[in-house]
């Protein structure tokens, strides 16, 4: 006799309507022993100022240019930009196997604060508000010239961060990147088929179910999406229809700072380490269309799985077949939800 399906025990696939892909969920594998790579935990106390850091105030960058003695978030042109403003278009090819297109743009760096030691969860909500204001200013400026502006942060050496001073990046593109183009298509198709906005509908469903919500504030929710790929992946969304960061009300912007601090604090508290991740915002492009199908959201993709030293590797089947995870989204959300919103470094002894 076939056993009844149990999502915490039996392998199954979950569909991600946002990117039109499936993920294999294998919860029984979470019980397997681990004898693989153990990454060294680097938890030494960082100074608030490092004279050797290229990003600290008044220091010389690798190009020889001096940083100002900044006291709030500081933005500058990336010294090793992946995109250039004046890039000629390649010649058109008639061969369908050898196609290329023009890629113009700009790359900028945003230092979140002058303090070398403070990542987002260690900043105050007011300090994070200042970061959000700069994000919004950059979107307005760059969105006037480019159809896509990507705000993101790679936190930690495990995510390829090349400088320990807490910072993010802002890339402006003359084109829609692959992930964004896919989300644009799926959200547009959903609106045409259902007459409503996909991620607005999704927020309503998750608010009713509550089992995958990690943090909820007045205007925002952070949750482990039903279709999550990374072990403790989260999706951050406003509760109402908002297409871009620049369209947030003052109250929504302030509340975004609150939930960013709470969510990233829970991440750090999970394994009591500075939790690595890649995060970024997706929102309506600056392409002259109404983009009613779009809903602002942020993706957090952290690699850690079992501890501060054991991470998820996207290899083998994930590279050649489809994405796979062990822990269910509901189990991951339960663990994150139960964590304190007071950072482990700030707890009273």
From Swiss-Prot:
Superkingdom per UniProt: Bacteria
Residues that, per the record, bind UDP-alpha-D-glucose: 29-32, 78-79, 154, 160-162, 169, 312-313, 317-318, 324
Pathway: Carbohydrate metabolism; galactose metabolism
Cofactor note: Binds 1 zinc ion per subunit. Zinc binding seems to play a structural role.
Keyword Zinc appears in the UniProt entry: yes
Result for mutant: residue 221 to V: In strain: RM 7004
InterPro entries: GalP_UDPtransf1, GalP_UDPtransf1_His-AS, GalP_Utransf_C, GalP_Utransf_N, HIT-like_sf
Effect the entry attributes to changing residue 229 to V: In strain: RM 7004
Binding site for Fe cation: 183, 282, 297, 299
Cofactor(s) essential for the protein: Zn(2+)
GO biological process: galactose catabolic process via UDP-galactose, Leloir pathway
Documented EC number(s): 2.7.7.12
EC supergroup of this enzyme: transferase
Binding sites annotated in the UniProt record for Zn(2+): 53, 56, 116, 165
Single GO term (MF): UDP-glucose:hexose-1-phosphate uridylyltransferase activity
Catalytic residues of the enzyme: 167
Keywords: Carbohydrate metabolism, Galactose metabolism, Iron, Metal-binding, Nucleotidyltransferase, Transferase, Zinc
Catalytic activity: alpha-D-galactose 1-phosphate + UDP-alpha-D-glucose = alpha-D-glucose 1-phosphate + UDP-alpha-D-galactose
Entry GO CC: cytoplasm
Family, per entry: Belongs to the galactose-1-phosphate uridylyltransferase type 1 family.
UniProt protein name: Galactose-1-phosphate uridylyltransferase
Record organism: Haemophilus influenzae (strain ATCC 51907 / DSM 11121 / KW20 / Rd)
